[in-house]
Curated annotation (Swiss-Prot):
GO molecular function terms attached to this record: N-acyltransferase activity
Physiological role: Catalyzes the N-acylation of UDP-3-O-acylglucosamine using 3-hydroxyacyl-ACP as the acyl donor. Is involved in the biosynthesis of lipid A, a phosphorylated glycolipid that anchors the lipopolysaccharide to the outer membrane of the cell.
GO biological processes: lipid A biosynthetic process
Family matches, as CDD domains: LbH_LpxD (cd03352)
Protein's organism: Pseudomonas putida (strain ATCC 700007 / DSM 6899 / JCM 31910 / BCRC 17059 / LMG 24140 / F1)
Record's protein name: UDP-3-O-acylglucosamine N-acyltransferase
Keywords: Acyltransferase, Lipid A biosynthesis, Lipid biosynthesis, Lipid metabolism, Repeat, Transferase
Record's catalysed reaction(s): a UDP-3-O-[(3R)-3-hydroxyacyl]-alpha-D-glucosamine + a (3R)-hydroxyacyl-[ACP] = a UDP-2-N,3-O-bis[(3R)-3-hydroxyacyl]-alpha-D-glucosamine + holo-[ACP] + H(+)
């Protein structure tokens, strides 16, 4: 789908100050390096400032300070990246699904599907499920018994919702995501693992986004819960009984063990792992590949592990780490000897 808007229209949408011709046609968005004369770009990161003067973009979203001295067309805004985020949807070429149920879809007789919803080819909607207004269910999706998908939801092809999953409004779920799979619960009987039925469900709030191949397990007794506005990247594992607070964001490959609770407005970078049964307070940032082994009670930034270094240096550091315990013992012995020498009856300035 091709979209064209004028600079004047974009300025009105954003409440921006326009420097340039209102009638200039904008057909899309691109980076400063790649944008052409009918495309809009933006400068949000100072490290890309070097590309601004030579950009061929038809116009650029800029802060007032960056717009000073720039000869090209500009839309001056307080936050160029946020402005870009807002107008990106105007130029999104994603196909719009048409309302209706595809003939190949299998829909239970007692399932409730709003007339404005779109149900794609070979989708399955089981007994008691409810699909809200303007929901789009992609091809080959599975919606289990008694699931609820709130209005405006968008499920890409091959999303799986097991039974008793409740999805809020305007939720986006990407392909391969599995919501409501059985949690990893077993009891050990003399070395043999006995399965524990996972009889809870999953409850997901409004405006949540769930990435490709992410798994959210159902609760053992009560629901696993994802708060409003949570953003989950690809290949994240959320175990049974986990609770995630509103507007928390997680990058790819985060793994959260069972019954851990994460607060609101937290950010977990890629590859972070959390053990089970801990609490993370609000407004916490955890850097990539950190292993969180205990509760965090104070807002702030946290890290673990070692940063990248040349291989030879890393090998030396690793070798030293193996000897830390022995070195600590030797240091304690040395401190005792120093104390003995310095306090062994020698004269002092007061003696």
């Amino acid at each position: 789908m091709s979209v064209t808007m004028t600079l004047g229209q974009l300025a009105e949408v954003l409440g921006a100050t326009l420097k340039g011709p209102e009638a200039l046609q904008i057909t899309g968005l691109a980076t400063l390096q790649e944008a052409g004369p009918t495309q809009l770009s933006f400068l949000a990161n100072p490290q890309y400032r070097k590309y601004l003067d030579n950009s061929q973009a038809g116009a650029v979203l800029l802060k007032a300070a960056d717009a000073e001295g720039f000869a090209g067309n500009t839309l001056v805004v307080a936050d160029p990246y946020l402005a870009y985020a807002r107008i990106s949807h105007l130029f999104d070429p994603k196909p719009k699904a048409e309302a209706g149920i595809h003939p190949s879809a299998v829909v239970a007789e007692d399932a409730q599907v709003d007339a404005s919803a779109s149900i794609g080819p070979f989708a399955v909607i089981e007994s008691g499920a409810r699909i809200g207004a303007n929901v789009s269910i992609g091809a080959h999706c599975f919606i289990g018994a008694r699931c609820v998908v709130g209005e405006g939801g968008w499920l890409a092809p091959r999303v799986t919702l097991y039974h008793d999953v409740t999805i809020g409004k305007r939720v986006v779920i990407q392909s391969g995501a599995v919501i409501g799979g059985e949690g990893f619960g077993f009891a050990n009987e003399k070395g043999i693992w006995r399965k524990i039925a996972q009889i809870g469900g999953v409850t997901i709030g409004d405006d949540v986004e769930i990435g490709v191949n992410t798994a959210i397990d159902r609760g053992a007794l009560s629901d696993t819960r994802i708060g409003d506005g949570v953003k989950l990247d690809n290949q994240i594992q959320i175990a049974h009984n986990v609770q995630i607070g509103d507007h928390t964001a997680m990058a790819a490959c985060v793994g959260i063990s069972g019954s851990t609770r994460i607060g609101k407005h937290c950010m977990l970078a890629g590859g972070v792992g959390l053990v089970g049964h801990i609490d993370i307070c609000d407004n916490v940032f955890v850097s990539g590949m950190t292993m969180v082994t205990r509760s965090i009670t104070e807002p702030g930034s946290y890290s673990s592990g070692t940063a990248m270094q040349p291989l030879a240096d890393w090998r030396k550091s690793a070798a030293r780490i193996r000897h830390l315990d022995d070195m600590a013992k030797r240091l304690q012995q040395l401190e005792k000897r120093v104390d003995t020498v310095t306090s062994g009856g020698l004269p002092t300035s007061e003696g």
